[in-house]
Swiss-Prot record:
Name of the protein this chain belongs to: THO complex subunit 2
Subcellular location: Nucleus
Residues found modified as Phosphothreonine: T1406, T1408
Positions carrying Phosphoserine: S1577
Positions of region (Disordered): 1-21, 1337-1628
GO MF: DNA binding; mRNA binding
Protein purpose: Component the THO subcomplex of the TREX complex, which operates in coupling transcription elongation to mRNA export. The THO complex is recruited to transcribed genes and moves along the gene with the elongating polymerase during transcription. THO is important for stabilizing nascent RNA in the RNA polymerase II elongation complex by preventing formation of DNA:RNA hybrids behind the elongating polymerase.
Organism: Schizosaccharomyces pombe (strain 972 / ATCC 24843) (Fission yeast)
PANTHER family listed in its UniProt record: THO COMPLEX SUBUNIT 2, THO2 PROTEIN
Family: Belongs to the THOC2 family.
């Protein structure tokens, strides 16, 4: 380039002159041109502006224009730059602006431009003007003489340079030269494969031949390179190293050799990893990625573009070659990337296409009503054509999209291990790994190599010895010939390698010898990470780049989980990092991975390093946010929902194993979705609970943990209402979900219920008590216990026994004891480990008193509040029973705070605090047999129950005295208050028959075990366990009896100072109504609070009141207590109770009424138990201030007691009638519950029953509330059934003799126990019996025997009665004629020796140890006699559960007993006919078989001969004296209880008893208080029968005459017998 011409002197003068002409207006433009800080664009813009003002706008004169540029060229040092800008501007104005924008003034502007050019050409180089400006413009400014000639010269020169061929680039132009080149390459490849020549020598010779051939035949080097690359791609598999060496030594070789990772020294590796770690895994792309354009890249790009246009699909080997050239630094990726198709814009659209594809699949995966329904039938015409008769249009064939060359190159780069180049592409298009699984698999293959060193430190193989690991790496030996019997193993043969382009040929090969051609070198350039820092900074970003594509490689996910298990520590950074990995990678990945239980367990091992709240937060994000964020998860979630709903529709109890596995298979990948759907259906359909619980046995630990989270989420859902629409009960969904929760936590030990308990505790703390049902179901299901309301009467009675009987009674007999035991211990360990037991105890105790006040106004329905209180009571009971069952004494004491802490620190009510403290001393409240236990007391050295030897009850008196007002202690002592609350039912009651029943059941199980065909060892083991149980029951019964006697002995001495301990003048002033107030305070402060706690406590209160009376407690008035019980406060008391409390009060009231009714029916019993010749002060009328002296004149006589009892009935009728007629819900509901409980004892009077019946009828007819209406309907039916047993008030009270209309409303019914066969000797008796059976009539409950002090001579019989009596008398005479005295004696002896006789005798007195031993020996004799095959009538079921009870009716196995029963039946038939109108005295009797059997047993001693009567009197006197000697007055309570229990076979519940699950037992009676017609003890029955026999013989003749006279005076009942029977059936 020539420099600018120098200016002459004249020019300088002209310039200076022009400079003077410049004004200040144009001076800034000069500054813009010459300023050094001006950019290129700013200078060009200033030049164009000056040209426009001068040429176009004519605002700048030409001379001033020249002056501006002259000064600019003078001042500017870089004149060439300004000259270049001016020349470009001249070209622009000449070719574009003047011609296109100024057509009107074109000539003027062109002239001005020419003049400017002529003036400026002196400052511009001529060469630049000739090369840039148009030829015509150059001619105009006088640079060239002829512009056309210059233009022709330029054309000729370009033609010569561009179109004259010097080298041959077509095969047809120089075929010989190209053929020679190809032959040289083929010969070299042949030598290389045959290994005939050295490879290095071949490479040198081939390169020489290439150069010589190009020079000799004038070949185009680019064409030669193209041919070499084509040969390279075709011979890639076995000759890639050869071609790379040829190209490396050729002129097209790389400028710089690249060092791979395995070639770097350790120092460079460390530096590289540090730089890579600091850059978070981002490579520092050096010049090899940004090389200038090379010939090789242009040749490759041209070929690739041609192949894309021609749809050449066989490009895999070509892409592999390009990838090798990139890896070995021949070309850079940016040089080749621009030549690949499709464009970057189209490649970026792949993400949108991928998401649209997933959305479409998601839409199709969603099930709807139409797709889930059955297919519809096709509507076709007869000829098979469609309805419209038209053929379906042909679907146009979709043109297959061309394969992406960029994806092919990326796949090849990943295949050969070029990680750095691959990351350059993946960093820009990371979604490619998610959209194309083959790319992600190749990428993960490289990551495996990178983290291999780190994973080796945490692999399970590291735990193995080195020699074992080495043996695992050795190839497995294979058999030489599998057809031979004796197989000889040999090492496998070496494989003949066959190279393939498939990177996974070694994994998915069709033949054993196929391998990837580059398998030896693909890992040579992958950095190997060494420590966790590099893993976090490098590997984790690489894994995040793959993202959800990791689902295609579960192995790398497993490795990641195992590394995390070892690396998660207590540091916050580590935990935060792994939480982010779990949240963003692992949990979403588990949804997309196919069923992989191993991976599920590995992930849960990592999750278990975090607490439950953190895990549940992760599950919540996983199930909600992640499912909506990623389209892959959204699709998988839709598929899971559809599959889950389909499985649940088909899941039943019969196919749980099949469909449960399918449900678990779906659950492994997406447990939150599966369980959410399952729980939603469980909340609606209860029948799914059991089948879903069964199907959960196939799921993993992660699934169980997610299930707990889903349960908690469902419980805590604020949008679900916890009450039904009526607001009176718990919602159905909450009840069903709580039931499922309890069952599933009991069934599976993998589930941890800590979170559920913690949730319930938090709910309690915020006064959300509706979740009590959750804790109730959890405790009930996991412990096998049931609330008091779900227990039968037998279970409640059995709970009063020792630990063994208590556990047998309270446990669910149909539960597997091993399952319950394991689940109980799991629950206890959970509560103890997390300190939740004490929290629950205290919270429940507090909420027991405050839960009714925690409800809101909108939930204040009385029924809801009542049920809430009952639920709290049930849960507290279950928790206490559970802790008492599984805790050791020491741990149990630690769990329960002391009494002082409960009262003072936790502000718990006294009755609840005593309730908790009693459980500390449950087994032995006052006595004990194990002196090592902290609860035991030595009674020989103890005079008071409250002594320091019992640490549990060593409560400071100041604590007790502060519980009640000070004036209360003037009426009873703190010692009594503490004694009452500390004692339990165990201390005052022995469930004798429950012990007998359980031991009898144990012997039945022994017989079943003997009969079962089991192995000897199993049989011996089972028999030993059952015998151990029987012996435990026997020992426990002995201990219980001894404990009862000891307790009574202690209380007998302590009761002296219980009431009015300081006398009636404690402070010098007399106490007003002292004994009445004692009874009142006893009721309000002791009895009333405790009886509401539980059925056990209700029974205890009744027994305790009876105990106070029987002990002759000074200053205690039983009559005053009963007056307070039946006074006007009863309706208010009923209203204030909940439903369960009303049930408990009903039990208490029944026990009290039963005892009072027994005294009412038997004057002798009343005098013995209530008066005791004045020794018992309970019914004293007059009291002395000094001492309670025995004085019969001061006690209540029997006739006045009858009037008092009648008055109480009248009061009760009035109170309950007012409650039934009330509109208050609690009045009605509670009163009906109580009335049903006391129905056997109340009402007994016609007036009372009629009033209550009318009230119940009105209630069932007019009540709109369904629950009350159902209750009233049930009570009305039961009351109607009892109506025939009622008597009039006059008859009941004995004030006025009954009128004719009240006498014998129905004839006497004579029933006979059914038997199967009769002895031949009694055939004639059977014939007479058949005649009498046709005349069966009902009992007459209004007989005069109900009237106290009345005699049978006062009774009046109806006409039908007279007829029956005459027939009965005739039958009696015939029976006496046929039955001899010897037969009766033999029958009596036989009856006494039967087991039933022994049991009946046992019930009539206090059991002793000798009685128990005799009973044991008798049971063993029965057992040994029943072992014969002929006597086995029981099933051969082998029951491993010692506490389970057979659900089938137990049958008597002995044929001898059947014969004895038939003989006894004959004797009883003959005895019954001697009654002649003897009416039962029990108003509770019902016309059923149990009543008849009871009457038969009670009348056996009434109809013997005079000699037999005398013998019976002597025997009875001896037995009576013996009983009095054994028991005495102090044991009268126990005698009465046992005697009443002994008559349970005659109860209105039938001859056989039922245990907790309703199974019958003919051996022993029910432990529930009997409801039989015979309410008296056997001794009293004998005395009464003797009196009746003597009176009957004296009045036998007079009665017949009197009956006949009354029959004539009485109107005849003309109703037919069939009509009367029909009427009787309707009433019943």
């Amino acid at each position: 380039m020539t420099s600018l011409p120098e200016k002459d002197q004249q020019g300088e003068v002209s310039v200076s002159e022009n400079q003077k002409k410049l004004s200040e207006e144009w001076e800034p433009y000069i500054d813009k041109l010459v300023a050094s800080n001006r950019t290129r664009d700013e200078r060009v813009e200033s030049i164009q502006e000056l040209f426009q003002k001068c040429v176009i706008e004519e605002k700048l004169p030409v001379d001033i224009f020249f002056s501006i540029f002259s000064l600019a060229f003078e001042r500017l040092e870089e004149k060439n730059t300004l000259a270049s800008y001016v020349i470009d501007t001249l070209w622009l104005f000449d070719t574009e602006w003047i011609k296109n924008f100024h057509e009107g003034s074109h000539d003027k502007a062109e002239k001005r431009l020419v003049s400017i050019g002529k003036g400026l050409k002196e400052f511009l180089p001529e060469e630049w003007l000739l090369s840039r400006l148009d030829c015509k413009f150059l001619e105009n400014i006088n640079v060239v003489p002829n512009g056309d000639f210059l233009n022709r010269k330029i054309v000729r020169t370009n033609t010569s340079l561009l179109y004259r061929q010097k080298k041959f680039n077509l095969l047809r132009e120089e075929s010989e030269g190209f053929s020679h080149l190809m032959i040289n390459f083929f010969d070299a490849l042949t030598c290389l494969r045959n290994k005939s020549l050295n490879e290095d020598y071949l490479i040198v010779q081939v390169n020489k031949s290439i150069i010589s051939t190009i020079g000799a035949f004038d070949l185009d080097p680019n064409k030669v390179l193209d041919l070499i690359l084509l040969l390279f791609s075709e011979n890639l598999l076995d000759s890639w190293r050869f071609f790379l060496s040829i190209l490396r030594n050729s002129p097209w070789g790389p400028n710089k050799e690249r060092k791979f990772w395995n070639q770097l020294p350790d120092r460079e590796k460390e530096t590289f990893l540090n730089n890579l770690s600091n850059a978070n895994g981002i490579f520092n792309f050096d010049e090899r990625f940004t090389n200038t354009k090379s010939i090789m890249s242009q040749v490759l790009g041209h070929n690739l573009q041609y192949m894309y246009k021609e749809d050449d699909e066989n490009l895999e080997s070509y892409f592999m070659m390009v990838a090798l050239l990139i890896k070995y630094n021949f070309i850079s990726i940016d040089n080749i990337w621009a030549h690949l198709s499709p464009s970057d814009e189209e490649l970026g659209k792949e993400l949108g296409k991928y998401k649209d594809k997933l959305d479409e699949q998601t839409f199709k995966a969603k099930g709807n009503a139409l797709t889930m329904a059955a297919p519809l039938p096709d509507d076709e015409i007869e000829d098979g054509e469609t309805m419209d008769g038209q053929k379906a249009e042909a679907v146009p064939e979709i043109k297959k999209a061309k394969p992406s060359q960029k994806l092919g190159l990326l796949k090849s780069l990943l295949s050969i291990g070029d990680l750095s180049s691959s990351l350059l592409i993946l960093g820009r298009y990371p979604f490619l790994l998610r959209a194309y699984p083959e790319l992600s698999n190749l990428y993960h293959k490289l990551l495996h190599i990178s983290i291999s060193s780190i994973y080796a430190n945490y692999s399970p193989l590291k735990l193995l010895p080195n020699d074992v690991r080495e043996r695992l790496k050795q190839p497995k030996f294979i058999p030489e010939d599998s057809r031979l019997r004796e197989i000889t193993l040999r090492p496998p043969k070496e494989k003949n390698l066959v190279f393939s382009l498939d990177p996974f040929a070694d994994r998915f090969n069709k033949t054993e010898s196929e391998v990837f051609y580059y398998f030896e070198n693909y890992d040579e350039d992958i950095p190997i990470l060494r420590n966790l820092t590099e893993f976090y900074n490098i590997a984790i970003p690489w894994l995040r780049l793959s993202g959800l594509a990791l689902c295609h490689d579960p192995v790398i996910v497993t490795k990641l989980c195992r590394i995390g298990q070892k690396c998660v520590d207590n540091s916050s950074e580590s935990r935060t990092l792994w939480l982010d990995i779990i949240r963003s990678l692992l949990l979403p990945l588990i949804t997309l991975i196919d069923v992989n239980t191993g991976l599920s367990y590995e992930l849960f091992e990592l999750l278990s390093k975090f607490d439950s709240s953190t895990r549940y937060a992760l599950y919540g994000e996983w199930s909600s946010t992640s499912m909506k964020k990623f389209p892959e998860l959204k699709l998988q979630n839709s598929i899971t929902e559809k599959e889950t709903k389909g499985i649940l529709r088909r899941l039943t109890k019969t196919n749980v194993k099949q469909f449960g596995r399918l449900l678990a298979k779906v659950c492994h990948s997406n447990p939150c979705t599966v369980f959410s759907i399952a729980l939603n259906q469980i909340e609606t359909y209860d029948n799914l609970v059991e089948v879903v619980v069964d199907s959960a046995r196939f799921i993993t630990a992660l699934d169980f943990d997610a299930l707990t989270f889903i349960i908690l989420s469902s419980f805590s859902n604020e949008f679900k209402k916890r009450l039904k629409s009526d607001g009176t009960s718990i919602a159905h969904w909450l009840q069903g979900l709580a039931s499922f929760c309890g069952r599933v936590f009991r069934r599976y030990s993998s589930l941890d219920c800590t979170s559920i308990v913690e949730y319930v505790i938090k709910q309690f703390k915020v006064n959300q008590m509706f979740d009590l049902v959750i804790l109730k179901e959890l405790l009930s299901q996991m412990t096998g216990l049931q609330p008091w309301t779900n227990l039968s009467d037998n279970q409640i009675q059995g709970a009063a026994g020792g630990p063994v009987l208590r556990q047998l009674s309270l446990s669910l007999i149909y539960e597997n004891p091993d399952v319950v035991r394991k689940s109980s211990m799991r629950l206890f360990n959970t509560l103890q480990k997390n300190g939740l037991a004490t929290q629950l105890l205290v919270l429940l105790s507090q909420k027991y008193s405050t839960c009714i006040y925690d409800v809101t106004d909108e939930n204040s329905h009385l029924k809801l509040i009542s049920s809430l209180q009952d639920e709290c009571s049930d849960v507290l009971y279950l928790l206490m029973e559970f802790l008492n069952m599984v805790c050791s004494p020491k741990s149990y004491y630690k769990l329960i705070p002391s009494f002082e802490q409960l009262i003072q620190d936790f502000h718990i009510q006294p009755q609840v605090a005593f309730y908790l403290s009693r459980y500390k001393n449950l087994d032995h409240s006052l006595t004990g047999s194990n002196t090592e236990d902290a609860m035991d007391i030595d009674y020989e050295n103890t005079s008071s129950p409250n002594t320091a030897s019992n640490p549990v009850w060593s409560i400071d008196n100041s604590v007790i005295t502060e519980l009640l007002p000070k004036q209360i202690w003037d009426y009873f002592s703190p010692n009594f208050y503490l004694t009452f609350w500390k004692l339990s039912l165990y201390d005052v009651f022995v469930p004798l028959e429950r012990y007998e029943f359980e031991r009898s059941r144990a012997f039945d199980q022994i017989r079943q075990t003997d009969a079962a065909n089991t192995f000897y060892s199993r049989h011996r083991h089972d028999r030993q366990k059952i015998m151990q149980l029987s012996n435990s029951l026997q020992n426990e019964l002995k201990e219980h009896i001894n404990s009862l006697e000891s307790v009574r002995k202690v209380l007998q001495g302590d009761c002296v100072k219980w009431f009015i301990p300081n006398g009636v003048f404690p402070n010098g002033t007399r106490l007003e109504h002292a004994r009445f107030n004692c009874a009142r305070y006893l009721w309000t402060l002791c009895i009333a609070p405790r009886l509401k706690m539980s059925p056990h406590d209700a029974l205890y209160c009744a027994k305790f009141v009876k105990l106070l009376h029987s002990l002759g407690t000074p200053n205690f008035s039983t009559m005053s207590f009963l007056e307070i019980l039946f006074n006007s406060q009863l309706p208010s008391f009923i209203f204030s109770m909940t439903q369960r409390e009303a049930d408990n009060f009903g039990r208490f009231l029944y026990e009290v009424l039963y005892d009072i009714t027994s005294w009412y029916r038997d004057k002798i019993l009343y005098e013995r138990e209530c008066l005791a010749n004045g020794a018992l002060p309970g019914f004293r009328l007059y009291w002395s201030d000094e001492q309670n002296d025995p004085d019969l004149s001061a006690v209540l006589p029997y006739n006045k007691f009858v009037l008092l009892f009648s008055k109480w009935h009248k009061y009760l009728t009035s109170y309950f009638e007012s409650c039934l007629l009330s509109t208050e819900y609690m009045h009605i509901y509670n009163s009906v519950i109580i009335l049903e409980k006391i129905l056997p004892c109340f009402p007994l009077i016609i007036e009372s029953g009629s009033a209550l019946k009318r009230a119940a009828e009105r209630l069932k007819d007019e009540e709109k509330r369904e629950d009350l209406k159902v209750l009233a309907l049930g009570y009305f039916a039961k009351l109607s059934k009892k109506q025939p047993e009622w008597v009039s008030f006059n008859s009941f009270s004995g004030t006025v003799r009954p009128s004719n209309s009240e006498k014998l409303q129905r004839p006497q019914q004579l029933s006979v126990a059914a038997t199967s066969a009769v002895d031949s000797k009694t055939a004639s008796i059977s014939e007479e019996q058949a005649k009498i059976d046709k005349q069966k009539v009902a009992l007459n409950p209004s007989a005069p025997e109900f009237v106290p002090d009345s005699t049978p001579s006062d009774a009046v019989a109806s006409e039908t009665d007279n007829k029956n009596l005459v027939e009965n008398k005739a039958v009696e005479k015939r029976v006496e004629a046929r039955s001899s005295a010897n037969e009766r004696k033999q029958e009596e002896r036989r009856r006494k020796t039967t087991p039933e006789g022994n049991r009946r005798a046992l019930r009539t007195r206090t059991p002793t140890n000798e009685d128990i031993q005799r009973s044991d020996s008798k049971l063993r004799e029965d057992q040994s006699r029943d072992r014969t095959p002929q006597s086995r009538s029981f099933t051969n079921e082998n029951n491993d559960n010692l506490r389970s009870v057979s659900r089938h009716t137990r049958r008597e196995p002995q044929q001898a007993q059947n014969l004895n029963a038939r003989r006894e039946h004959e004797s009883q038939k003959s005895d019954r006919w001697r009654q002649n109108g003897n009416v039962n005295r029990n108003p509770r009797v019902s016309n059923n078989n149990s009543t008849n059997v009871s009457r038969e047993r009670s009348s056996e001693a009434n109809h013997r001969t005079s000699n037999d009567n005398k013998r019976d009197e002597v025997t009875e006197g001896k037995d009576k004296n013996k009983r009095q000697d054994i028991s005495g007055e102090s044991n009268s309570r126990q005698n009465n209880a046992i005697s009443r229990a002994g008559r349970s076979n005659g109860s209105n519940r039938g001859n056989d008893s039922r245990d907790a699950d309703g199974r019958r037992s003919t051996h022993y009676a029910s432990n529930k208080r009997p409801r039989s017609s015979d309410s008296q003890s056997p001794s009293n029955l004998r005395e009464e029968d003797e009196r009746e026999n003597s009176r009957r013989r004296a009045r036998q003749d007079d009665r017949r005459d009197r009956d006949s006279r009354q029959q004539r005076d009485r109107p005849r009942d003309r109703t037919s017998r069939s009509a009367r029977e029909e009427k009787r059936r309707k009433i019943q």
